[in-house]
Amino acid sequence: MSEFSQTVPELVAWARKNDFSISLPVDRLSFLLAVATLNGERLDGEMSEGELVDAFRHVSDAFEQTSETIGVRANNAINDMVRQRLLNRFTSEQAEGNAIYRLTPLGIGITDYYIRQREFSTLRLSMQLSIVAGELKRAADAAEEGGDEFHWHRNVYAPLKYSVAEIFDSIDLTQRLMDEQQQQVKDDIAQLLNKDWRAAISSCELLLSETSGTLRELQDTLEAAGDKLQANLLRIQDATMTHDDLHFVDRLVFDLQSKLDRIICWGQQSIDLWIGYDRHVHKFIRTAIDMDKNRVFAQRLRQSVQTYFDEPWALTYANADRLLDMRDEEMALRDEEVTGELPEDLEYEEFNEIREQLAAIIEEQLAVYKTRQVPLDLGLVVREYLSQYPRARHFDVARIVIDQAVRLGVAQADFTGLPAKWQPINDYGAKVQAHVIDKY
């Protein structure tokens, strides 16, 4: 767990005094990654200057840079890495001119971010949580046993500070890396949809499902172990309440509790945000499909009219009498059944006016649920509204009610992944499947 004992002015003065600075253009960063990769293949973790020059040569060739000044540029790059405390140089009088180089903690941290921490592993997270659970249980047992100050430092404070806190930081880093991966997936989906949304649908579905599954897997693993971890932290906290000289342990336990709560809460929040993005992408795809169908129909109709004199055509339509003995006399055909899906500009103006009036009335009536924070059962509400209108308008009224209701909030049961029960909404067999909206 990150903890700063110095104040901000002290840290600023310290950084200025030591002339700390990092400048890594893409070629220098590539060189550092190459050094880290080659260094990982060696048991001793040491590299000679000649090996660094060879690594620089590979990077220089990849960037199509001239090879005539390779020695000078490699020497400048190595010296720059040493100056920025990314590499440590060791020399000896016996082997003058043959220096040995090792990556510094700063260099390892930068390369580790780019190389090793890019993959999410449920097994790795489970092992980390298992280690944390074991350390916390031993620390809680030691806290309940009690002892002198040395006992608290060695058996309680040290495991919490140098094992549990560091693993919590590692899990937090994993979440932040997944935040970056989510943003990268969003960029990939945007590029796919901008190129050819027809061919991109399957790829988008794969990216969305993989990211959603990874987030859910991470959160399920955290929540499964979260209660047990919090219980052991509470045991330690209860044991320190009777000791006035253990403020340092109590403060550390509080920090760990806050860190664990933050990790679990952000995991759930990231899932909620991703669900919203998933719905947004699917809505965009559905809109694109509808627009494309109407665009193709309009294009064919326009082309047929333009080429009428070259290729005449005839339009035949049938207007058969209604079978009064087989149909309800009061039933009116809806426009959608006759014309199919049409753009809003081609819909009947009268129906638009009626729909807008109904939407305004229903929106005002449903707002009471949000104001009073009362759960909204869509099945009951839709059934109540449909009982006030003729059967021919049931579909349109139900659609308006549902559109206005989902704008008020969401159902927390949607996030459980369990399907809602089907509820009848009229006496003619129509049903709706929706959870109770309880989060506005």
Swiss-Prot record:
GO terms for biological process: cell division; chromosome condensation; chromosome segregation; DNA replication. SUPFAM superfamilies: MukF C-terminal domain-like, Winged helix' DNA-binding domain. GO terms for molecular function: calcium ion binding. Keywords: Calcium, Cell cycle, Cell division, Chromosome partition, Cytoplasm, DNA condensation. It comes from the Bacteria. It is found in: Cytoplasm, Nucleoid. Pfam families: KicB (PF03882), MukF_C (PF17193), MukF_M (PF17192). GO terms for cellular component: cytoplasm; nucleoid. Residues 208-236 are annotated as: Leucine-zipper. Belongs to the MukF family. Interacts, and probably forms a ternary complex, with MukE and MukB via its C-terminal region. The complex formation is stimulated by calcium or magnesium. It is required for an interaction between MukE and MukB. Involved in chromosome condensation, segregation and cell cycle progression. May participate in facilitating chromosome segregation by condensation DNA from both sides of a centrally located replisome during cell division. Not required for mini-F plasmid partitioning. Probably acts via its interaction with MukB and MukE. Overexpression results in anucleate cells. It has a calcium binding activity. This is Chromosome partition protein MukF.
